[in-house]
Design a protein with these regions (language model features):
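Membrane-proximal, non-transmembrane interaction modules
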Residues: 1-85
Length: 85
């Protein structure tokens, strides 16, 4: 079962590709969101939160829960609203 954060990060990469920013194979999730944060500086904190949580889920294999999940979901909602404008 794929956690929502993985689906969201895939969506985020699609948005980046639409802007002409493909993700290099050697690029980490945090480097990628950092690149997006340079363009959308108003989303820097939210993007960094998403990158950190995505990395945690991807490499630990555990589901999110509690406060961390709530914070990441709120960040993802703000990012999605902004990028869909």
């Amino acid at each position: 079962n794929q956690p929502w954060i993985r689906r969201f990060f895939s969506w985020l990469m699609e948005q980046g590709e639409a802007l002409g920013w493909g993700r290099r194979p050697s690029e980490t999730a945090n480097e990628y969101v950092g690149k997006l944060a340079e363009k959308y500086d108003d989303l820097e904190v939210d993007l960094m939160t998403i990158g950190q949580v995505y990395t945690q889920v991807r490499y630990s294999g555990r589901e999110l829960g509690g406060e961390v999940e709530e914070k990441a979901q709120k960040s993802s909602e703000r990012v999605q609203r902004r990028l869909e404008q």
